[in-house]
Swiss-Prot record:
Listed Polar residues bias regions: 312-324
One Pfam short name: Pkinase
Chain segments carrying region Disordered: 308-348
Organism of derivation: Caenorhabditis briggsae
Active site: D150 (proton acceptor)
A single GO BP: mitotic G2 DNA damage checkpoint signaling
Superkingdom, taxonomy of origin: Eukaryota
Domain (Protein kinase) ranges: 26-286
SUPFAM superfamilies named among the record's database cross-references: Protein kinase-like (PK-like)
Protein name according to UniProt: Serine/threonine-protein kinase chk-1
Family matches, as SMART domains: S_TKc
Amino acid sequence: MSADVSTKPRGSLPIPTAPGESNECYRVIRTLGEGAFGEVLLIVNNKNPDMAVAMKKMQITTQANTNNIRKEFLIQQKLSKVGHDNFIRAIGMRTENGFHFLFLEYADGGELFDKIEPDHGMPTAIAQFYFRQLIEGLKYIHDCDIVHRDIKPENLLLTTSHVLKISDFGMATLYRNEGKERLLDLSCGTIPYAAPEVCAGGKYRGPPIDVWSSGIVLIAMLTGELPWDRASDSSYAYLQWLGNNNLDENPWRKMDVRALCMLRRILTDNVHRRATIEQIKTDPWFTHNYGKLEMTYGRPLKRARYADENSPDCNISSTQQADAVSTAKRRHLETPDKVAHVERQNASFSQPTRTEDLLLTQNIDMSQNNTNLLERMVCRMTRFCTKFDVPTSYRQLIHASEHAGYEVRQTADNRLLVTFREVSMMVTLYSLKTESRVMVDFRRSRGDGIQFKKMFLEVRNRMNDSICVDGQNFLEDCGYVPRKPQFVREANA
């Protein structure tokens, strides 16, 4: 169907509630993400697998750790009381046997960064479609007196009906209490997306730093690259931007004048002049009609019926969507029975306490786009099919990765951990039972999402002769990779 990008994605969807005191009512399907202090698991109701919830499992270590985890839950619980389509809702929390369990809404469409093509980005209409949702989500969060402090594509999840959801509130905090705003001083976030006042290490206002980060996200969507490594005097590219000296260079020359003018208002180091969310919503780029998108919508997941011992009355609105292909249709995938333990990446569910800890959040993937063993597979772009069997494909994969200059380590049967500098990706080979093909699946393990996509493209290009020509259509038909949204420009646009 055709959807005007000026409108929101489809609205009211099912309402899940949290698992109850007994673990017998649900089972773990797979690991969604891992970190030094815990993991995120996909769990489903035993009686109805369509009832899916993300469960964040964190070990109790110190009182400070417990306080930070509870703070994260209370923030999301506060946001969930009224609810909004554009953030991941907290469903419940439980503590038992030395672990905290945080139950969250599950977004089955992957991460926003997966839609960003390195060095190209995405069509302006699609970028505008997602950016409008990001701004609506931030407006709601800020209106609830909360600031996120780590807005980046990896923390922006999608549903199969193209609803964008802000996730990971581990660095979020209350910036206003009873109408009185307070200055913040904790240096946190991810460096390339962090505002200059955060990088400087001083006190700062809450909402403007989220606005800044949203501008960097928009640049990534429009151009497929980041403008600088750090918004500080140590970055030549950043100083050139402040001096208005490099607009004929990348990434600026990849965008139109409207986008550039809006970004000038967003990415100013003068906090008092930086655009507010209300000003962004009336900006010519934001309101311009760039066209229509051909959207396909998934079937809503059924409502999960659970109870939570800490939040017995928890009943939160959700926007979960079922996969376009039924679980039964996806059972022609074979995965290795034995999975070796993989060292958990450096991660933090709580808030960094030093400026140098900003780097920490670049080495973690607590997102919901990671897949290990399959029963329900998130649709993702970073997959392809080969013409050969698993052993041959495995050797070719190692050869292509090593010749690209990447470090390759086998972690389990048919699984490889491929690393280049600060970025790692887990590669898994799946034998298709009903097809004489092997599907190669890449997922980001740590590091920047755009750099991960560049690594994937490098390996894929080196294996081009081995890729099955009709494999892409097969993966699209099965729902393992997304179909590209159709863009229709209006005659008067």
